């Protein structure tokens, strides 16, 4: 059986198409409004305050402690875990520092062997973490 045909078929075709749209992943994502319930609430970056520095164990078969920070977002008070990239960059971050957080690259999913961490630290006290790591800039004295 194919599509309904004929002069009086428009309503049936229109309703069918409207119902079938919900099977499309991108349509569902844009129309359900779930983007506003996520920690960033639709934006690409967010500022937050570091609550504590934490180490998260990597998933099997890897064995490591990935350095992360527990951050409370300023815009809505939500607490998230954010990965601190590069070797030794956790030393540039202190508790109560203001950090800029970005997504981690898999559209809201955890990356690699770090379970439950969907964000990464980009800036600390207004200075790029990469610039601090390469020693091109210094962290401002607070």
From Swiss-Prot:
This is Small ribosomal subunit protein uS12. It comes from Fragaria ananassa (Strawberry). Residues 11-20 have a biased composition (Basic residues). The modification Hydroxyproline is found at residue 61. One of its GO terms (molecular function) is structural constituent of ribosome. It comes from the Eukaryota. Keywords: Hydroxylation, Ribonucleoprotein, Ribosomal protein. Belongs to the universal ribosomal protein uS12 family. The keyword Mitochondrion does not apply. Disulfide bonds: none annotated. GO terms for biological process: translation.
């Amino acid at each position: 059986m194919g599509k309904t045909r004929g002069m009086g078929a428009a309503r049936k075709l229109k309703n069918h198409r409207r119902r079938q749209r919900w099977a499309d992943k991108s349509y569902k994502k844009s129309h359900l409004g779930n983007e506003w319930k996520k920690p960033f609430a639709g934006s690409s970056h967010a500022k937050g305050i570091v609550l504590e520095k934490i180490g998260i164990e990597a998933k099997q078969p890897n064995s490591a402690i990935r350095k992360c920070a527990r951050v409370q977002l300023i815009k809505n008070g939500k607490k998230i875990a954010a990965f601190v990239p590069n070797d030794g960059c956790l030393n540039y971050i202190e508790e109560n520092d203001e950090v800029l957080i970005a997504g981690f690259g898999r559209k809201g999913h955890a990356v690699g062997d770090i379970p439950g961490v969907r964000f990464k630290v980009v800036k600390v006290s207004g200075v790029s973490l990469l610039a601090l790591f390469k020693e091109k800039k210094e962290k401002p004295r607070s």
